[in-house]
Curated annotation (Swiss-Prot):
Keywords in alphabetical order: Cytoplasm
Keyword field contains Mitochondrion: no
Name the record gives this protein: PF03932 family protein CutC
InterPro entries: CutC-like, CutC-like_dom_sf
SUPFAM superfamilies per the UniProt record, alphabetical: CutC-like
Amino acid sequence: MTKLEVCCYSVDCAQIAEKAGADRVELCCGQSEGGVTPSVGALMQARETVTIPVHPIVRPRGGDFCYSSNDFTIMKNDIARIRDLGFAGVVVGVLDTDGHIDMPRMREIMSVSGSLVVTFHRAFDMCQNPMIALKQLAELNVARILTSGQQQNAELGLALLKDLVAATKDQGPIIMAGAGVRLTNMQKFIDAGIRELHSSAGRTVPSTMRYRKAGVTMCADSDVDEFSHYCVDGEVVEAMKSLLVMGSPLAKHT
């Protein structure tokens, strides 16, 4: 059966995702930056309160995936902490200046990761040649690749996603479709033979604050609403999971 990974920007969201039936959580913070490394406090709380597999992202900043020596050292330290805390896996990716997989650095990451299951994240979508990148990640024994098919969303990238699935039919990383995967279009990915889906399955929820200071924001973008935040929608996760269960071979023959 196709698995559902839910992208969660807080431990609260991870708990909602688990209760709603998600198979796995990608734990991040910094939604506006596309997901960066969660804090040590968030990691510890997730380990204590979430029982399904949690794969934290290790991304020290937003922007590109070519990192300074300090950034890279921080990443290795974070991976070691995640490993020592007993997480199931980690989500990471490093490119070189020419848009290729940074093989020397990724080898170091794989070594530091130890028994962690490694997902190469959407840095893959910024690679110059996706099929070469796929071969390199297979050589590294990366477990899965999170990708939109090198498009702004995975629905637009379906053609490449199908090619990647075909190329890994017998061996290689699991191809996990992500970016714009939602209840209304997920059947397209199921029909394409994609084994894992990644979705934020979320909505914007209002702040619980009654007093709301006007004219001041904590962000450089003055249009940001300080009194709302993004959160996983448990009902959406339940509906997505139900569709996956109904589409499984077992369900079709019962």
